[in-house]
Swiss-Prot record:
Alphabetic keyword roster: Metal-binding, Ribonucleoprotein, Ribosomal protein, RNA-binding, rRNA-binding, Zinc
Signal peptide location: none
Binding site for Zn(2+): C16, C18, C37, C40
Role description: Binds the 23S rRNA.
Organism: Pseudomonas putida (strain W619)
Cofactors demanded by this protein: Zn(2+)
Subunit-level organization: Part of the 50S ribosomal subunit.
The protein's name: Large ribosomal subunit protein bL31
Entry's cofactor comment: Binds 1 zinc ion per subunit.
UniProt entry tagged with the keyword Ribosomal protein: yes
Assigned protein family: Belongs to the bacterial ribosomal protein bL31 family. Type A subfamily.
Pfam family, any one: Ribosomal_L31
GO term, biological process aspect, one: translation
Length: 71
């Protein structure tokens, strides 16, 4: 590898919008602000919403279901 072409890989203080703070390593700089982390993301907290797509599927079948049948 060539010398002096790679960015510095430093410790970064990450702050989430929920207030959680942790430290990781990155080439971005010394501080990083993020919107979601493992403490506030719905997948990890178990508070995720399940979207009901059954109505959309039924509406599609009602509108276009007749095109698959032969007369």
């Amino acid at each position: 590898m060539k010398a002096d072409i790679h960015p510095n890989y430093e410790a970064v203080a990450v702050t989430c919008s929920c207030g959680n703070k942790f430290e990781t390593r990155s080439t971005l700089g010394s501080t990083l602000a993020i919107d979601v982390c493992n403490l506030c993301h719905p997948f990890y907290t178990g508070k995720q919403k399940v979207l009901d797509t059954g109505g959309r599927v039924q509406r599609f079948a009602d509108r276009f279901g007749m095109f698959g049948t032969k007369k």
